[in-house]
Amino acid sequence: GYTEPQESEHDFFIIGHTSTSVSLASGLAKGRDLTGGNENIIAVIGDGSLSGGEAFEGLDYVAELGTNMIIIVNDNQMSIAENHGGLYKNLKELRDSNGQCDCNFFKAMGLDYMYVNDGNNVQALIEAFSKIKDIQHPIVVHINTLKGKGYARAEQDKETYHWRTPFNLETGEAKVNDEEEDYSEVTAQ
């Protein structure tokens, strides 16, 4: 989501979510290193945001920095705008080969790489992160997930359920507070 310092003491900046996480985390990692810290710095980025220029710059800098940083790529094959291009072809090759194909964009950039095929399986995630939590160099953890897993409506209509206000789980209809004006009422005024 969006970082907002008033919302969380762990958010240092106000920024949007698209393509910013890796570059932001690289700055935090550099700051940690300059002050002698050793905590894990973790960036989470979706495959839809991965194609942004700022994400590429962040990956490039992290590889050059060579320090402890975990980059989680949540690959749910979903973006509001359809994914196109070589990066997405490579992500598919990596998914299809269980992360083992010879052509690996992340390794080509100089980053270590781990693939988790069932990213909706909590135990698989715990095992993966247990293996790398003390790593002292940058690593990409490529996690293959199913958007909306476990809620049939979200699995079938990824775009509608990409982001939702509170809704009734049984009907999928938005919960509306009767005392508040809805969007249609406000725009009609």
Language-model-derived ranges and their functions:
Residues 40-42, 68-70, 138-140:
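Residue-level preference for the first positions of well-ordered beta-strands
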